[in-house]
Amino acid sequence: MIQMQTNLDVADNSGARRVMCIKVLGGSKRRYATVGDVIVVSIKEAIPRGKVKKGDVMKAVVVRVRKDIRRADGSVIRFDRNAAVLINNQSEPVGTRIFGPVPRELRAKNHMKIISLAPEVL
């Protein structure tokens, strides 16, 4: 579960390393985001010569959360770190590669480009 002020890793090669959630999109009183949700983030740490720089405000899709993700068949999946992928205003990833596994739940939220770039879908 991601809320305002949550720090996340960046799971793409956009140049950002750490981001902080500054808003959960989807309603004025929406408090938490989970896998597949879109959030607004501020870049807190970035590498030199990346596509983004520190202080930029962008949208991101949450791809991994430490909170248990319960599936319809009763199984549970959980990741070690919270992570997100930066997207532009057209909901396309800023980076060209995705690092680490992503869950199948992204398919239901229509993030097919992220699924196709990911090395492993759990």
Curated annotation (Swiss-Prot):
Gene3D superfamilies: Ribosomal protein L14
Name of a matching Pfam family: Ribosomal_L14
Quaternary context: Part of the 50S ribosomal subunit. Forms a cluster with proteins L3 and L19. In the 70S ribosome, L14 and L19 interact and together make contacts with the 16S rRNA in bridges B5 and B8.
Keyword Acetylation among record annotations: no
Family the entry assigns: Belongs to the universal ribosomal protein uL14 family.
Protein name as catalogued: Large ribosomal subunit protein uL14
UniProt record, GO biological process: translation
Entry keywords, A to Z: Ribonucleoprotein, Ribosomal protein, RNA-binding, rRNA-binding
GO molecular function: large ribosomal subunit rRNA binding; structural constituent of ribosome
Keyword Metal-binding attached: no
